[in-house]
């Protein structure tokens, strides 16, 4: 028998305490469940506390349920990388192409849904941090992602706990583990 549809307002009322920093995600449909056909569906709240760029080998589908978020992306095919910010407003959807470095910035009282395709067997995810001063990669970690609910958080925490990993080898700047107050402006809630 198939499970019932997930009512987002009711789920948030009963489970919003599960959306905790640094990632603030909760997998409502886990790929290990036979009912999901390998897909991962997460509810993600804000504010999150991360500055990493994640590279997934499959596309990611974003639906912004409440408020606006900012999806920071990086084109690493050029040096230095070219950065582009993509606002995703309430009620909007966005399909991020596979292998695009991205940093989802979520603000207070915002909620989104992210859906990811099943990853090919032994596909390697990458998380990396860029230097704000010179644009070089400060640190990166590659791993086979089997549980988005825990592994991304673990890598973010590993980076945050080690100043050597956070120090740019090119210029010596120490990378921040979260954006500073006022550093990133929340896009307007609704498009005018």
From Swiss-Prot:
GO molecular function: 3-hydroxyanthranilate 3,4-dioxygenase activity; ferrous iron binding
HAMAP family per the UniProt record, alphabetical: 3_HAO (MF_00825)
Lineage: Eukaryota, Fungi, Dikarya, Ascomycota, Pezizomycotina
Annotated S-S bridges: none
Pathway named in the protein's UniProt entry: Cofactor biosynthesis; NAD(+) biosynthesis; quinolinate from L-kynurenine: step 3/3
SUPFAM superfamilies: RmlC-like cupins
Main localization (coarse): cytoplasm
Domain of life: Eukaryota
GO cellular component labels: cytoplasm
Organism of origin: Neosartorya fischeri (strain ATCC 1020 / DSM 3700 / CBS 544.65 / FGSC A1164 / JCM 1740 / NRRL 181 / WB 181)
Record-listed O2 binding positions: 50
Entry protein name: 3-hydroxyanthranilate 3,4-dioxygenase
Binding site for Fe cation: 54, 60, 102
Gene: bna1
Record-listed E.C. numbers: 1.13.11.6
Biological processes per GO annotation: 'de novo' NAD biosynthetic process from L-tryptophan; anthranilate metabolic process; L-tryptophan catabolic process; quinolinate biosynthetic process
Subcellular localization: Cytoplasm
Record PANTHER family: 3-HYDROXYANTHRANILATE 3,4-DIOXYGENASE (PTHR15497:SF1)
Role: Catalyzes the oxidative ring opening of 3-hydroxyanthranilate to 2-amino-3-carboxymuconate semialdehyde, which spontaneously cyclizes to quinolinate.
Reactions performed catalytically: 3-hydroxyanthranilate + O2 = (2Z,4Z)-2-amino-3-carboxymuconate 6-semialdehyde
Leader sequence residues: none
Binding site for substrate: 60, 106, 116
Pfam families the record matches: 3-HAO
InterPro entries: 3hydroanth_dOase, RmlC-like_jellyroll, RmlC_Cupin_sf
Binding site for a divalent metal cation: 131, 134, 168, 171
